[in-house]
């Protein structure tokens, strides 16, 4: 990796299939690397997800959110790779991507889920059945800071496994 910021690692462990995933900020892009047995996995190295704001910007938080690994969809393929993509512009919309182990799009996830008007993201998403329907949801947190004065807010999102919004709620932090 040649990026200037690297997320915390996530480990995919399913029988003999074991890989380490990291996201990297490199040249204004978010890239994902997969490593198995010390070598890069060709379908992931790197997988360019898209543009993001420079995490070294002093006006932003200095962390990349980590990848989450969980059984998100109804596919029988096992666990999926949840990639949080911070906003491409300051105050823009962050996104969530869900991939299969081989780097393809997971069922119902052939495009990103945009966290509209949510702002920046630096917290790692969590996955679990938070509404009791038997299906996993992706829980993400975004925030907006206007830079001066009041108006900072945090939004908690619950995204269904089928790429639809379960719920969102926003908290004013002023």
Predicted features, each with a name:
Residues 38-47, 104-110, 162-168:
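Beta-strand initiation motifs
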Residues 35-37, 72, 101-103, 130, ...:
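Inter-blade boundary loops/turns of WD-repeat beta-propellers
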Residues 33, 65-66, 84-86, 93, ...:
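Solenoidal tandem-repeat scaffolds enriched in leucines and small polar residues
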Residues 1-8, 51-66, 114-125, 172-174:
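Repeat-based blade/solenoid architectures
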Residues 29-33, 94-97, 152-157:
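A short loop-to-beta-strand structural motif that recurs across blades of beta-propeller domains
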Residues 24, 85, 101, 106, ...:
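Threonine-centered tandem repeat motifs in low-complexity domains
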Residues 7-14, 19, 65-74, 80, ...:
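Beta-propeller blade termini
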Residues 24-29, 86-91, 143-149:
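Short glycine/acidic-enriched loop and turn motifs that connect beta-strands
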């Amino acid at each position: 990796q040649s990026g200037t910021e690297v997320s915390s690692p996530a480990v995919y462990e399913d029988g003999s299939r074991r890989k380490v995933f990291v996201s990297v900020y490199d040249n204004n892009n978010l890239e994902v690397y997969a490593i198995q047995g010390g070598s890069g996995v060709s379908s992931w190295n790197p997988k360019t997800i898209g543009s993001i704001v420079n995490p070294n910007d002093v006006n932003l938080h200095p962390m990349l959110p980590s990848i989450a690994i969980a059984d998100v969809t109804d596919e029988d393929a096992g666990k999926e790779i949840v990639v949080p993509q911070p906003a491409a512009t300051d105050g823009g919309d962050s996104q969530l991507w869900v991939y299969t182990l081989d780097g393809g799009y997971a069922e119902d996830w052939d495009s990103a889920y945009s966290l509209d008007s949510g702002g920046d993201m630096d917290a790692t998403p969590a996955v679990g059945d938070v509404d009791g329907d038997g299906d996993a949801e992706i829980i993400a947190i975004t925030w907006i800071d206007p830079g001066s004065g009041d108006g900072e807010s945090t939004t908690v999102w619950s995204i269904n496994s089928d790429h639809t919004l379960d719920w969102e709620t926003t908290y004013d932090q002023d």
